[in-house]
């Protein structure tokens, strides 16, 4: 394994752990920002977080046109995070959050697809 491949794996796994950690905390920074600004930022952050997860996962995926791995990963992580919200104080299960997670991940896959196509 070359250093480039190793770094991609480290970035992907670190980011995935960070996402799981942040989404399973009782109070999030996003919620604090929403309260301070009066804006609904939750869905945008779900989309952007999983867009990055999709990009990192697809770049880490050695099979260039294989998308089931990344989509499955997004579904599993999204479901895991949303179902843990049943038991975490001050968190709510929202199906729309899961939808934005998946849309973000698929958008990340599309970005990597076009990036690789140009190279």
Describe each region flagged by the PLM.
Residues 46, 50, 92-112:
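Alpha-helical transmembrane segments that form the membrane-embedded catalytic/substrate-binding core
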Residues 56-62, 111-116:
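Structural signal for the C-terminal ends of transmembrane alpha-helices
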Residues 1, 116-119:
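Short, charged juxtamembrane terminal tails flanking transmembrane helices
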Residues 60-63, 67-85:
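Membrane-embedded catalytic cores of phosphoryl/pyrophosphoryl-handling enzymes
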């Amino acid at each position: 394994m070359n250093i480039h491949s190793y770094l991609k794996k480290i970035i992907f796994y670190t980011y995935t752990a960070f996402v799981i950690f942040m989404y399973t905390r009782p109070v999030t920074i996003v919620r604090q920002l929403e309260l301070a600004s009066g804006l609904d930022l939750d869905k945008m952050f779900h989309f952007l977080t999983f867009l990055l997860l999709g990009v990192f996962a697809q770049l880490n995926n050695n099979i260039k046109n294989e998308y089931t791995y990344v989509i499955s990963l997004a579904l599993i992580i999204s479901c895991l995070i949303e179902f843990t919200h049943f038991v975490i104080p001050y968190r709510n299960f929202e199906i729309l959050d899961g939808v934005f997670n998946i849309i973000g991940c698929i958008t990340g896959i599309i970005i990597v697809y076009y990036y690789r196509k140009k190279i």
